[in-house]
């Protein structure tokens, strides 16, 4: 079987695709691959923060279109970039084992959020990271930053920023581990799906789905299902400052979730254990708790997203 894989062309996307291919080959020996490189709107328009472009699934949509058009068999994504709602003709079919779900502060001197110098300039284009950081450090200036990982690190080294906030998983996949300080999910709840690579295929490809499901990590797949159900119930897209992390432990999800306004003035964060027998229901339970405690804030954020 030859599997045509649609992916973005960045170093991180290609590394994630390699992880997927290696995982598939562990469980299916008679498989070959062909890469279909897709350039997305998010790759082309680097002039604005993602939340100002105003397109849902800015990194996901065009890659999935290659599958819908029959040009590729599957699409590979950072699951955190994939909206809760995708085409009805597509489905999430595989997740390799999850990598580190946390956010990380990257600096030249291994600062933590607490030890960042007063009035530091911190780079991120994520409203979620911006809001939770400002809720902890009102003195810092958050400056948007775009581009691939190497570009961002170069801007840090050039002195344009004192620190960056990035996904720990992406740094680890590219073997960037110097001067990295992880941020606790209780302080900055990660984006739903962060640290997970998602593989999407057409619903009607039973032959392909069988191969891919055999290669999937079930624990990670359940965590993905819970977090995406959480995101779906809130009704939020990738540009709402919302975090949700469900980690399986002995039949329960340790679920940490939160929401914050972009200026860090108002936030809600909670951690709880929820029965994991039905991952989608667990995600909805977490979402209902967040809505009970922060309904007004969520409504305002959704209105302007």
From Swiss-Prot:
* Coiled coil location: none
EC number in record: 2.5.1.61
Q: Which UniProt keywords apply?
A: Porphyrin biosynthesis, Transferase
Instruction: Name what cofactor the protein needs.
Output: dipyrromethane
Can you state which reaction this protein catalyses?
4 porphobilinogen + H2O = hydroxymethylbilane + 4 NH4(+)
Q: One GO term of the cellular component aspect?
A: cytoplasm
The family database entries (InterPro entries) matched by this protein are listed as: HemC, Porphobilin_deaminase_cofac_BS, Porphobilin_deaminase_N, Porphobilinogen_deaminase_C, Porphobilinogen_deaminase_C_sf
One of its GO biological process terms is: protoporphyrinogen IX biosynthetic process
Question: S-(dipyrrolylmethanemethyl)cysteine occurs at which residues?
Answer: 238
Tell me the route in metabolism or biology where this protein functions. Porphyrin-containing compound metabolism; protoporphyrin-IX biosynthesis; coproporphyrinogen-III from 5-aminolevulinate: step 2/4
Claim: Transferase is one of the keywords in the record: yes
Q: Which GO terms describe its molecular function?
A: hydroxymethylbilane synthase activity
Pfam families per the UniProt record, alphabetical: Porphobil_deam, Porphobil_deamC
Free-text remark on how the cofactor is bound: Binds 1 dipyrromethane group covalently.
Q: Remarks, anything else?
A: The porphobilinogen subunits are added to the dipyrromethane group.
Describe the function of this protein.
Answer: Tetrapolymerization of the monopyrrole PBG into the hydroxymethylbilane pre-uroporphyrinogen in several discrete steps.
Q: What family does this chain come from, according to its entry?
A: Belongs to the HMBS family.
Q: What is this protein called?
A: Probable porphobilinogen deaminase
Q: From what organism does this protein derive? A: Caldivirga maquilingensis (strain ATCC 700844 / DSM 13496 / JCM 10307 / IC-167)
Chain's gene name? hemC
């Amino acid at each position: 079987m030859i599997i045509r894989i649609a992916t973005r062309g960045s170093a991180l996307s290609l590394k994630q695709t390699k992880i997927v291919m290696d995982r598939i080959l562990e469980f299916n020996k008679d498989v070959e691959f062909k890469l279909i490189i897709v350039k997305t709107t998010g790759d082309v328009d680097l002039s604005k923060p993602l939340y100002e472009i105003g397109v849902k699934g800015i990194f996901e949509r065009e890659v999935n279109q290659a599958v819908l058009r029959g040009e590729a068999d599957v699409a590979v994504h950072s699951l955190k970039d994939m909206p809760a709602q995708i085409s009805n003709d597509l489905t999430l079919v595989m997740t390799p084992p999850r990598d580190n779900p946390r956010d990380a502060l990257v600096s030249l001197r291994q600062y933590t959020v607490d030890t960042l110098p007063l009035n530091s300039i911190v780079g991120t284009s994520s409203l979620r990271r911006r809001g939770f950081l400002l809720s902890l450090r009102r003195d810092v200036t958050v400056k948007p930053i775009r581009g691939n990982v190497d570009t961002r690190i170069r801007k840090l080294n050039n002195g344009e920023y004192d620190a960056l906030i990035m996904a720990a998983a992406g740094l680890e996949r590219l073997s960037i581990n110097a001067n990295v300080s992880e941020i606790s999910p209780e302080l900055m709840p990660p984006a739903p799906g962060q640290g997970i690579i998602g593989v999407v295929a057409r619903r009607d490809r039973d032959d392909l789905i069988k191969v891919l499901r055999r290669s999937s990590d079930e624990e990670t797949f359940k965590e993905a299902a819970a977090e995406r159900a959480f995101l779906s119930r809130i009704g939020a897209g990738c540009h709402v400052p919302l975090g949700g992390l469900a980690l399986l432990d002995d039949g329960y999800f340790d679920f940490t979730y939160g929401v914050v306004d972009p200026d860090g003035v108002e936030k809600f964060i909670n951690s709880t254990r929820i029965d994991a027998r039905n991952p989608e229901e667990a995600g909805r339970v977490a979402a209902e708790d967040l809505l009970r405690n922060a309904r007004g804030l969520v409504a305002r954020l959704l209105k302007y997203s």
